[in-house]
Amino acid sequence: MAALTDVQRLQSRVEELERWVYGPGGTRGSRKVADGLVKVQVALGNIASKRERVKILYKKIEDLIKYLDPEYIDRIAIPEASKLQFILAEEQFILSQVALLEQVNALVPVLDSASIKAVPEHAARLQRLAQIHIQQQDQCVAITEESKALLEGYNKTTMLLSKQFVQWDELLCQLEAAKQVKPAEE
């Protein structure tokens, strides 16, 4: 039964191929694709039996397919022992990655929690708070600059007053010294 369905499936595929080749009108005359394929196979068989080099090529097709396989270079270039050594050399890194993946796996319920799922709902509030924070930072910078200017003014005033007091103190000392000297002269 299965062989019959395989034959029917193959027949339908050949008919579809004929429609592709010959168009929707069907086959032209009595030529069918299957007949052409049989003729090509017979011709190739005749050529192969007559030519020794072609026989050798047919035998080496499997080798050619094996060599064309992209993984073939990896199998030849890196022997199994080297692959094993590479894996063993990276053992600590692999184990650390496993531990990290286990931590992520353990935290998956947190990611699936209602709080995390509600984040999009709070995005507008967060954006508004971020704008307020930026405004407050700007205000803080302005207040800092203003405070710095006031402190510089205070320091200048204090320094000028200190210099003035020092000058007055020196003048007072000179006047007191002159006053003490005058009575002694009389």
From Swiss-Prot:
The keyword Zinc does not apply. One of its GO terms (biological process) is cytoskeleton-dependent cytokinesis. Keywords: Acetylation, Cell cycle, Cell division, Centromere, Chromosome, Coiled coil, Cytoplasm, Cytoskeleton, Kinetochore, Mitosis. Signal peptide: none annotated. Residues 46-66 form a coiled coil. InterPro entries: DCTN3 (IPR009991). It comes from the Eukaryota. Its main location: cytoplasm. It is found in: Cytoplasm; Cytoplasm, Cytoskeleton, Microtubule organizing center, Centrosome; Chromosome, Centromere, Kinetochore; Cytoplasm, Cytoskeleton, Spindle. Part of the dynactin complex that activates the molecular motor dynein for ultra-processive transport along microtubules. Together with dynein may be involved in spindle assembly and cytokinesis. This is Dynactin subunit 3. It comes from Mus musculus. The gene is Dctn3.
